[in-house]
């Protein structure tokens, strides 16, 4: 089944050229089915690239998904024009009056800043609080996961001695969780961050469950007891060359970054990386949509959140 996007969204053309099933709004309007309504709160500076990466994964599901993109009113983007954002992105005031089946909160390159010092932190907290009664399940990515764990559960983040950059092996510790259905015993996905959350803090909270860990990267995936909150500490949505782009970007800034671990063949940046996390990313995004959202959400979307009132 397709993902529905605005008629003239540039990402749609890219996805169609990759043979992804994308449905334009005017075609979807003629269908009489119950699609899933999804928000993507895109905090990444590379807006278009992140749109493509996430929508590519969502479009691989057998479910029709209506996607709305969300921007922060309290932040001025340095990398994406306001004209583009105003054309394709909603603000919180535009979406808060209704219910949503799911929401994705992306990462953001602000790990080295205290949460409270991030210029849009207050607005993000408002959105996360609102989501508890108005969004059925929220998937948090990288810094978005750290932010969500901190806001909802008081879990702190800790600075790393050096950037965690590379593709790391993970293993399931809750093998029967639906989110991991179909995953290999050992599965890989990228991390790109300067801070971490620690297992000992999460284990102490009875409302949270760590379902996947990495010997090198630490906590991999955390879910809440009711599946309403999902936290992925890495970037399984990344393209094959995203870590390469970040590595050369940091080199250009004179930052002397470490070569991403387990990424370039023979640790040689002149060689093209092999993408070994594509199937994992597709499985977990599809499982989230199917098992955490579609199979559990009320058919009447207005019933979302009523059991928490």
Curated annotation (Swiss-Prot):
Substrate binds at residues 163, 192, 249. GO terms for cellular component: cytoplasm. The active site is at residues 142, 235, 237. InterPro entries: Class_I_gatase-like, HST_MetA, MetA_family. It is found in: Cytoplasm. The record marks 192 as: Important for substrate specificity. Its EC number is 2.3.1.31. It comes from the Archaea. It is an enzyme of class 2 (transferase). Its main location: cytoplasm. Pathway: Amino-acid biosynthesis; L-methionine biosynthesis via de novo pathway; O-acetyl-L-homoserine from L-homoserine: step 1/1. PANTHER family: HOMOSERINE O-SUCCINYLTRANSFERASE. NCBIfam families: metA. HAMAP family: MetA_acyltransf. This is Homoserine O-acetyltransferase. The lineage of its organism: Archaea, Methanobacteriati, Thermoplasmatota, Thermoplasmata, Methanomassiliicoccales.
């Amino acid at each position: 089944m397709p993902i529905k996007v605005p008629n003239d969204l540039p990402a749609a053309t890219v996805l169609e050229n990759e043979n992804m099933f994308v449905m334009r709004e005017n075609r979807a309007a003629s269908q009489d089915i119950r699609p899933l309504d999804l928000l993507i709160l895109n905090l990444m500076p590379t807006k278009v690239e992140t749109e493509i990466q996430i929508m590519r994964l969502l479009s691989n599901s057998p479910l029709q998904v209506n996607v709305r993109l969300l921007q922060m009113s309290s932040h001025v983007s340095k990398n994406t024009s306001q004209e583009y954002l105003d054309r394709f992105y909603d603000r919180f005031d535009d979406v808060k009056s209704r219910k949503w089946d799911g929401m994705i909160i992306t990462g953001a390159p602000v790990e080295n800043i205290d949460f409270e010092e991030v210029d849009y932190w207050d607005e993000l907290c408002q959105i996360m609080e609102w989501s508890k009664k108005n969004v059925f399940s929220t998937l948090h990515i990288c810094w978005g996961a750290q932010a969500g764990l901190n806001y909802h559960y008081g879990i702190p983040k800790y600075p790393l001695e050096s950037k965690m950059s590379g593709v790391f092996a993970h293993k399931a510790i809750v093998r029967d969780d639906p989110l991991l259905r179909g995953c290999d015993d050992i599965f890989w996905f990228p991390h790109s961050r300067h801070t971490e959350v620690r297992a000992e803090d999460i284990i102490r909270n009875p409302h949270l469950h760590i379902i996947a860990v990495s010997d090198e990267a630490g906590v991999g995936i955390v879910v809440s007891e009711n599946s309403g909150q999902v936290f992925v500490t890495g970037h399984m949505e990344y393209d094959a060359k995203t870590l390469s782009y970040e590595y050369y970007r940091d080199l250009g800034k004179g930052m002397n970054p470490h070569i991403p671990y387990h990424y370039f063949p023979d640790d040689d940046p002149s060689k093209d990386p092999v993408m070994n996390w594509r199937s994992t990313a597709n499985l977990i995004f599809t499982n989230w949509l199917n098992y955490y959202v579609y199979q559990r959400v009320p058919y009447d979307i207005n019933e979302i959140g009523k059991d928490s009132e």
